[in-house]
């Protein structure tokens, strides 16, 4: 009986330590941008951070504001315009925002532009830069897609991609993301890396820009 109590106490302590560690990682991301989950070449790291910095310049932009209109203008003026469709102020605009960031950085050769998330996922697949392995550890500058209607199903998320953001950084089990059209603004999201509604990642080939 004595040993069972000791084991129970040790288990509780381990759980508490794990919880506190996760809380620490979460707070770290709230106060900063996080880290690269693995080492990448310096030139690639610089390019990834340039994309993230460009996205962060729009942080706080409210829907239907002047800045929102400017984001859509960047997207709509790009040629070729995906689907030949100009995004309106009343449209969902997360993919248009993520595309506009790439356009502003002259990275459309490695980031396919689209105003629809599921179509953009298809474009990543077409160029062989789509990743949906749950073990993948994202890097700053990766594009993260969600299927919010997947209803927390266990196993591989295969639902319809209906939202997208750009990875800012990681810490422990969490990812920090910047997103357009999050609660009708450009804002951060901190999400568990193994969240069941993460559809997958579009991976810009930053390395090819340094060859």
Regions found by a protein language model. Name each.
Residues 75-79, 127-129, 134, 186, ...:
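Solvent-exposed, flexible loop/coil residues
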Residues 22, 49, 108-184:
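...with weaker cross-activation on analogous glycine-rich loops/strands in unrelated enzymes
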Residues 3-9, 13, 19-40, 45, ...:
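Aromatic- and glycine-rich peptidoglycan recognition patches
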Residues 27-105:
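N-terminal capping segments
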